[in-house]
Structure formats: C-alpha cells, structure tokens
C-alpha cells in the first residue's frame, strides 16, 4: 500500500514537471511569431497614419480657404471670423509638421525604390503646403485692406451726435453721446494688426517646412518636374512635335 501510494504521489509530480517543461519551450516560439507579425504590420500602420494626417491637413486647408473668402463680408462678424481663422490656421500648421515628420520617417533611402503611396503622399503634402501659404498671403492682403477701411472710418475729428432726453422729474436735459468710441476703433485696428503678424509668422514657418520637404524628398521625386509627376503631356511627345514644326518652317522658307 505504501509503495502504491508513493507511486501515485510520484507520478503526478513527473507528469506536471514534463508539462511545465513543454510549456516553457513553446512560449519563446510564440513570442517570436508574434514579434515578427507586429514588425510586418508596423510599416503598414505607419503608412496609414501618414495618409490620415495628410488627408486631415488637406481638410484644414479647405476650411481655411473658405474662411479667407468670407473676409470683408458685412454679414459675418469679423472678430469671430478672425478667431476661427486663427484656430484653424494653428491646427493646420501642427498637422503639417506632424505629417512631414511621419512621412520622412518612412520614406527610406533616397536612392532606393520607394512605395508608390509614399510618392503620392509627398506630392499631395507639397501641393497642400503651397496652397496653404497662398491662402495665408491672401488673408494678409484682405485683412490689410480691412484695416485700411477701419482707419478711414475712425471718428477722430467727426461731429459728436448728442441726444437730449428730458427727464420727467427735472427740467435739465440728459446728454447721451451716440457716436462710436475712438478707443474701440483703435482696439479693432490693433487686433487686425496682430492677426496679420501672426499670419505672416505662420506663413514663414510653412514656407520653411515646404523647403525642408523638397530637400528631404526622395531622389526619384527630385529628378522629375511637376508635369511628369502628375502624368501630364510626356516630354518626348512635345519634343517630337517641335521638331516637326521647325522642319515644316524650313521647308516653307526654302
């Protein structure tokens, strides 16, 4: 009985030991497989993240353009419009910087082959930055003209309009000044000047980012012009037509 009991006690211990040994050997293999799968998915996830950033930046550029068109509209409150422009402009600059950082990290070597999607994102980001700086310049011009109009309407030497409101309990009239305050006009002009300076600062930052984007662009994109990048009229076809045209002129002149 004692030997049988000892055998019953020893067998589960051996089986448990063998089970633990098998499980320890299987865990590193599972970790290696999981690590290889994650490493394979990381570039694709980064590419999708860059694509989302460029698309969001494109949306911000479109929203900013719509606000620039509304500058000077009498039906739009100018302070609230300028506040919304500042908000979208700041958010757009942050998105552009973030998109450039992510795109530069996955572009790879300059002289090697790059993914076509990366080339498309580079071109799209470059076009968005060019349009963004152009719209900033437009907003500066429109805000400058708006500031000039406000200075022209500043009531510094204008006549003061006074209403006489007699009070029922007194015969002395109450003077009520209904003219606009020069301080308010000066405050508005100062706010517009501040918005112009902030827009100019952001425009310089985006121009520097555009120059940096062109410098860090992969070599296959640097060696091509805009027409070849957008698959427009091929250069050899245009050159061949010019040769035929010149030959025809020489034939007529002779």
From Swiss-Prot:
Principal subcellular localization: nucleus
GO biological process, one term: negative regulation of signal transduction
Ranges of Basic and acidic residues composition bias in the record: 27-36
Location relative to the cell: Nucleus; Cytoplasm; Cell membrane
UniProt entry tagged with the keyword S-adenosyl-L-methionine: no
Membrane topology annotation: Lipid-anchor
Chain intervals for the UniProt region annotation (Disordered): 1-38
Entry function: Regulator of G protein-coupled receptor (GPCR) signaling. Regulatory subunit of the R7-Gbeta5 complexes that acts by controlling the subcellular location of the R7-Gbeta5 complexes. When palmitoylated, it targets the R7-Gbeta5 complexes to the plasma membrane, leading to inhibit G protein alpha subunits. When it is unpalmitoylated, the R7-Gbeta5 complexes undergo a nuclear/cytoplasmic shuttling. May also act by controlling the proteolytic stability of R7 proteins, probably by protecting them from degradation.
Protein name: Regulator of G-protein signaling 7-binding protein
């Amino acid at each position: 009985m004692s030997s049988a009991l000892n055998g019953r006690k020893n067998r589960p211990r051996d089986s448990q030991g063998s089970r633990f040994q098998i499980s320890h050997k299987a865990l590193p293999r599972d970790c290696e497989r999981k690590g290889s799968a994650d490493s394979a998915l990381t570039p694709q996830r980064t590419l999708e993240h860059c694509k989302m950033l460029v698309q969001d930046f494109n949306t911000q550029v479109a929203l900013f353009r719509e606000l620039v068109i509304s500058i000077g509209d009498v039906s739009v409150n100018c302070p609230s419009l300028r506040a919304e422009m500042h908000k979208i402009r700041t958010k757009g600059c942050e998105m552009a910087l973030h998109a450039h950082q992510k795109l530069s990290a996955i572009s790879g070597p300059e002289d090697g082959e790059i993914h076509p999607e990366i080339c498309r994102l580079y071109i799209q980001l470059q076009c968005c930055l060019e349009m963004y700086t152009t719209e900033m310049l437009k907003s500066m011009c429109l805000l400058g003209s708006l500031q000039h109009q406000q200075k022209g309407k500043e009531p510094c030497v204008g006549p003061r309009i006074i209403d006489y409101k007699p009070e029922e309990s007194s015969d002395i009239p109450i003077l009520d000044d209904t003219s606009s305050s020069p301080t308010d006009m000066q405050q508005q002009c100062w706010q517009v000047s501040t918005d112009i300076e902030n827009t100019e600062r952001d425009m310089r930052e985006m121009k520097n980012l555009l120059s940096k984007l062109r410098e860090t662009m992969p070599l296959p994109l640097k060696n091509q012009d805009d027409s070849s990048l957008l698959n427009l009229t091929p250069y050899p076809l245009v050159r061949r037509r010019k040769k035929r045209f010149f030959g025809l002129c020489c034939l007529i002149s002779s």
